[in-house]
């Protein structure tokens, strides 16, 4: 009887380890932040939708706001342990012209290897999406001021586009009529 109980416990342990290993094969869970504030950082722009990664966590996509209120939120911020996103998808409209744009950024090769306590933040200027990684440490005097004004005292790296002067991205050529 004891041998049977031991075998049963061993089988349960092995199955539990296999299930735990299968669950761990998804994206790394890292304590970091994601957000944007179109009202302040992107005047004249309406965010139509966005999606950071594929976790579906609240604040990582505009889907819930669109379903509940008929439009995407214009500001969001989420902090804490969450899956590290592989991509950032954003669609937006220039309010003055009605022209719509979309862009998908592959974040895998752009993010630093250690994203703990870092913030991913995006803004839009006309037809160009900008993505930043904000390190919450004070910006050294010799570090350039980059990105949204509210982060001017922190170390900010622009990770997209690669360099100034990158051509505009993926116009959907829609206009308000």
Question: What residue spans do the PLM features occupy?
Answer:
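Bacterial N-terminal signal peptides that target proteins for export
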Residues: 1-12
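Edge beta-strands of extracellular beta-sandwich domains
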Residues: 100-106
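Compositionally biased low-complexity segments at domain edges in trafficked proteins
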Residues: 114-177
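Tryptophan-paired
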Residues: 48-97
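Bacterial N-terminal signal peptides
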Residues: 11-20
């Amino acid at each position: 009887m004891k041998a049977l109980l031991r075998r049963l416990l061993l089988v349960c342990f092995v199955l539990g380890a296999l299930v735990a290993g299968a669950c761990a094969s998804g994206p790394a869970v890292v304590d970091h932040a994601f957000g944007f504030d179109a009202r302040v950082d992107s005047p004249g722009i309406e965010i139509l939708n966005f999606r950071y990664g594929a976790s579906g966590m609240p604040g990582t996509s505009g889907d819930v706001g669109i379903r509940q209120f008929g439009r995407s939120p214009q500001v969001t911020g989420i902090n804490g342990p969450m899956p590290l996103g592989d991509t950032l998808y954003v669609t937006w409209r220039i309010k003055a012209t009605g022209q719509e744009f979309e862009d998908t950024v592959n974040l895998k090769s752009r993010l630093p290897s250690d994203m703990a306590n870092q913030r991913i933040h995006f803004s839009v200027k006309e037809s160009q999406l900008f993505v930043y990684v904000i390190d919450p440490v004070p910006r050294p005097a010799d570090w350039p001021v980059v990105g949204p004004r509210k982060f001017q005292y922190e170390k900010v790296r622009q990770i997209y586009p690669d360099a100034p002067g990158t051509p505009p991205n993926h116009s959907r050529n829609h206009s308000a009529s």
